Amino acid sequence: MLNEREKILLKTLVERYIHEGQPVGSRSLAKFSGLDLSPATIRNVMTDLEEMGYVSSPHTSAGRMPTTLGYRFFVDTLLVVKSLDNEQITLLENQLHPNNPTHLMNVTSRLLSELTRFVGVVVTPKRMGGAVFRHIEFVALTEKRILLILVTPEGDVQNRIILTETAYSQSDLIEAGNFLNQHYAGCTLEEIRSGLQRELTQLRRDMTGLMNAAIEIGNDALQESSEAVVIAGEHRLFDVRDLSDNLSSLKSLFEMFERKSKLLQLMELSRQAHGVKIFIGGESDETMLEEVSVVTAPYEMEGKIVGTVGVIGPRRMAYERIIPIVDITAKLLSSNLS
């Protein structure tokens, strides 16, 4: 645990590094920390922080810069979030109209990019994810093509063709439908998918092959209710010095933007949070994101989480400004969709 002096100096170092983009030396820390300490004493504290993994010292400079661990401690413990000014709030309120959901998602990602000067991301609601089902049925079309029939409480019928890697018999499919109808009728497809993932984790060892097949068929079906990722402002990353100097990192990021599946997996994690969630560098376990941070927040429709909004930028971002932008955008989007 850091003592108060270490916290103040780490906070000052992160803030100066975010502001200046250069390793921070002891004289700068003495000037901006408000502590009456000599440069020698500050250097000793920096050595301690470096040994604990909160800061690092590049070979070309006598100053220090925050590590991922340093950023994480700063964000979780030391950060003071700023309120959005009235002009920014008014802009969001005026632009986020619920008239056209697809247009609304495009506008949201664009506004996030414009307000932060980084990349704005919106994961749109699943086409079928919010539907409550009364009855599900699977019909074999060919060996690995299955027709999913979903009936809502209102009597609406939705059909979807599923391509599976495993061949299932019609009796397997009937058993799968019976299992889902018995255990999950009245749930949304999103709730079913979460439940099936738990079933796969908890019951796989003692489940019969047939029940295993039933759950996997259901999981295949629900995974097919695809989401879309709306991205705006990718070009802004070329203006970020921390990233533009590293072409291989930029290339990896743009590959992720193009494929979107990796980004979707990351954004999916924020559904489990009740507010803003922040991934810093390698915390996401995704090598493409080692040089960036992702700030996300879930949004709702009729009280259920249906998607996420987020901003992708350098680790050296003004978190105190980005966090409220993402947070308020998610809340306004929820309000307009409901």
Curated annotation (Swiss-Prot):
GO terms for molecular function: DNA binding. Keywords: Repressor, Stress response, Transcription, Transcription regulation. InterPro entries: GAF-like_dom_sf, HrcA, HrcA_C, WH-like_DNA-bd_sf, WH_DNA-bd_sf, WHTH_HrcA_DNA-bd, WHTH_transcript_rep_HrcA_IDD. GO terms for biological process: negative regulation of DNA-templated transcription. It comes from the Bacteria. Gene3D superfamilies: 3.30.450.40, Heat-inducible transcription repressor hrca homolog, domain 3, Winged helix-like DNA-binding domain superfamily/Winged helix DNA-binding domain. Disulfide bonds: none annotated. Belongs to the HrcA family. Negative regulator of class I heat shock genes (grpE-dnaK-dnaJ and groELS operons). Prevents heat-shock induction of these operons. HAMAP family: HrcA (MF_00081). NCBIfam families: hrcA. This is Heat-inducible transcription repressor HrcA. It comes from Nitrosomonas europaea (strain ATCC 19718 / CIP 103999 / KCTC 2705 / NBRC 14298).
